């Protein structure tokens, strides 16, 4: 392991060498052939507490985390769960079933949470389609890069709204498959019209195994999101705050693209477009074409 766990750690999360090794040797090696990312970098990016703070900053543009009761759908390796408890004093709960490419995530999360002297049993082995909590339980329901991996994303959205308190905030971050880049495969692509087409693109254009692509819910896009939220609103009124287009424009204007995982290639492209002076125009054109990514589905449950 070339990554120093002590240097990766922050005051809000102690990253252990054991966690780094476990992620590198499982998820890191699994995704190395898909993303073309070194397993050590994958492990470091997965467990970097600074990423959890970046996510919190986006969420806090809509609501304060301080002291809130928060459910994270897809806790992953537990870093958000730890950082948000220690930095924002939240009451944190999480769901983390293990799936394709992520078989040891629950075990890593619980061990890391325990190493940070927090309660590992707050992370439940459960799926977003059947959230094991009563109605109106949480101030915030949050998820990042999970919705595209579930069996029934529409049901996950309905369940997330169900357990959200009136006045609470929902934020779901996920890829937009009307966009032009897939981070799971570090692949540029035209807007995806079907999973079959996506598998074909990954197999024949990028010459990679399409097995993981077959698990992706490529129907997720802004049109799908607005339709689902509208249907939910018939029974549970919601106010949709954003689908992330403003954040996309801001990042494109500033050439502020994360270097996490395989996003470095995208960041270099955006920097090049900025040097050409066309990044601002292109950002707004992409939004008109509904191709921004990621989707940042943010809504409040009306009181």
Question: What annotation goes with each model-predicted range?
Answer:
Residues 48-67:
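Conserved alpha-helix/loop element of class I SAM-dependent methyltransferases that forms part
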Residues 129-140:
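A short acidic, Gly/Pro-enriched loop at the edge of an enzyme's catalytic core
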Residues 150-151, 164-166:
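Helix-to-beta-strand junctions that scaffold the AdoMet/dcAdoMet cofactor pocket
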Residues 154-155, 169-298:
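S-adenosyl-L-methionine-dependent methyltransferase catalytic module, highlighting the catalytic core
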Residues 68-76:
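Conserved class I S-adenosyl-L-methionine
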Residues 143-146:
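A short beta-strand submotif of the Rossmann-like class I SAM-dependent methyltransferase core
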Residues 150-159:
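A short, conserved alpha-helix within the catalytic core of class I
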Residues 79-130:
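Class I SAM-dependent methyltransferase SAM/SAH-binding core
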């Amino acid at each position: 392991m070339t990554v120093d766990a002590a240097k990766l750690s922050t005051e809000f999360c102690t990253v252990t060498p054991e966690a780094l090794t476990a992620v590198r040797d499982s998820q890191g090696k699994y995704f190395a052939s898909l993303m073309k990312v070194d397993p050590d970098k994958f492990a470091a990016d997965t467990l970097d507490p600074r990423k959890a703070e970046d996510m919190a900053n986006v969420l806090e543009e809509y609501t304060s985390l301080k002291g809130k009761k928060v459910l994270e759908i897809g806790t992953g390796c537990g870093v958000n769960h730890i950082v948000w408890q220690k930095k924002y004093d939240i009451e944190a709960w999480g769901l983390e079933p293990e799936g394709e490419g992520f078989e040891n995530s629950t075990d890593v999360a619980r061990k890391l949470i325990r190493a940070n002297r927090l309660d590992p049993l707050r992370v439940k082995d459960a799926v977003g389609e059947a959230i094991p909590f009563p109605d109106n339980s949480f101030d915030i329901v949050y998820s990042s890069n999970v919705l595209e991996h579930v069996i029934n994303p529409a049901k996950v959205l309905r369940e997330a709204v169900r357990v959200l308190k009136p006045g609470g905030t929902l934020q779901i971050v996920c890829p937009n498959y009307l966009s032009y880049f897939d981070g799971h495969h570090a692949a540029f692509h035209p807007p995806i019209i079907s999973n079959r087409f996506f598998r074909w693109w990954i197999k024949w254009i990028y010459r990679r195994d399409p097995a993981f692509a077959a698990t992706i819910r490529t129907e997720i896009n802004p049109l799908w999101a607005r339709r689902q939220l509208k249907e939910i609103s018939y029974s549970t009124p919601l106010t949709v705050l954003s689908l992330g287009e403003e954040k996309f424009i801001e990042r494109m204007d500033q050439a502020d693209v994360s270097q996490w995982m395989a996003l470095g290639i995208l960041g270099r492209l955006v920097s090049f477009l900025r040097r050409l002076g066309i990044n601002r125009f292109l950002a707004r054109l992409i939004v008109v074409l509904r191709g921004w990514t990621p989707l940042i589905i943010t809504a409040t449950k009306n009181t």
